[in-house]
Regions:
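N-terminal FAD cofactor-binding segment of flavoenzymes
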Residues: 33
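Active-site-proximal cap/lid insertion segments
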Residues: 1-6, 22, 26, 43, ...
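Short, well-structured beta-strand/strand-turn elements
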Residues: 90-103
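Short phosphate-binding/catalytic loops that engage adenosine nucleotides
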Residues: 19, 91-92, 246
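His/Cys-centered metal/cofactor-coordination and adjacent catalytic loops
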Residues: 45-83, 137-138
Length: 312
């Protein structure tokens, strides 16, 4: 999508081999409502999940504001039909890895149509253990060697599932925790982007959005390292499809659940030319990347300007 600071060769290749959507929108500018919309095809007002799960409820609101936040459902109802349940009923093997954030235990991926769950729990970020590095402290993801990187682990789990189900239809949903806070990158990647930042002469520049600062330049080395690690993980999964000869018969979709974090929690990225970011209903909060590759069905290198949304 044109960044000159972040490096994403796997995603760039995916765009060249499929369609790049320029007007794709999340159902909500925060995570849980959009994730529920992806799983169900329903808008947030239909699922009742209208804020991120864990957000303050009206009775717990402590800020002096004119309005209270609206109440919301804190889990995806089990009687709501999910994409995983539909595909499982159609004979697909179903697999989930990464961030779930759609309810407490009993409402996790294995309760919503997924045969296997690697890392999907109630948390919105990797807040247990050493977070983005093993030991993870995640009850649905066994610890790897000390220092193992979470995006790489989730990609390898996904690749292993694909290989073991190569001879039957499968639905593999890899929902990275990246690039959610906490901001943590591999040291080699952080150093790479610190050097790139210096070489390009980039410095932090700021604007204002209401009462908050907003970052105007992409130059945050840790965030850039997180983006590249995610891209490397995407490449791992795509390479597995190629190794197994499954590229031609596999639909690949890459998207996100809200805009980049530009106005809080470290202000790590910029969404310019779009206004604001995650948490805001401006373009910066809801316009998303969307890449679709389906050989023989989707024209390689095509660009789609038609507006689409996550329930689609």
């Amino acid at each position: 999508y044109g960044s000159t600071f972040y490096e994403t060769p796997a995603l760039d290749q995916l765009a060249q081999e499929g369609a790049r959507f320029t007007a794709a929108y999340a159902a909500c500018p925060v995570c849980s409502p959009t994730r529920a919309s992806i799983m169900t095809g329903l808008w947030p007002q239909r699922t009742g999940i209208t804020d991120y799960i864990g957000a303050p409820a009206p009775e717990a609101w402590a800020r002096n504001t004119l309005l209270l936040p609206a109440p919301y459902m804190d889990r995806l109802a089990l009687d709501t039909l999910t994409l995983a349940e539909l595909l499982k009923d159609a004979g697909y093997a179903t697999f989930f890895a990464g961030k779930w954030h759609l309810g407490p235990e009993g409402w996790w991926p294995e309760d919503q149509g997924f045969d296997l769950n690697r890392g999907g729990i109630d948390r919105g970020g990797p807040y247990g253990g050493n977070r983005y590095f093993s030991p993870y402290g995640n009850p649905r993801l066994s610890d790897g060697p000390v220092g193992e990187h979470l995006p790489d682990r989730l990609a390898r789990e996904t690749a292993a599932f694909i290989e073991s189900h190569r001879d039957r239809p499968f639905f593999a949903y890899l929902a990275f925790y990246s690039v959610h806070t906490p901001l943590m990158a591999r040291e080699d990647l952080r150093q790479k982007y610190e050097e790139k930042r210096t070489r390009l002469g980039l410095t932090a520049q700021w604007g204002r959005e209401d009462t908050r600062d907003v970052r105007l330049v992409q130059e945050h080395a840790v965030y850039a390292g997180m983006v590249e690690a995610l891209d490397l993980a995407v490449g791992t999964v795509l390479a597995k499809l190629d190794d197994l000869g499954l590229r031609e018969q596999t639909l690949v979709i890459f998207t996100s659940d809200n805009g980049g974090l530009a106005t809080s929690e470290g202000w790590p990225t910029s969404n310019l030319p779009w206004r604001a970011g995650k948490g805001w209903l401006y373009e910066g909060g809801i316009r998303e990347p969307l890449l679709v590759r389906w050989p023989g069905k989707v024209a390689a290198g095509s660009v789609v300007d038609t507006p689409v949304s996550s329930p689609d």
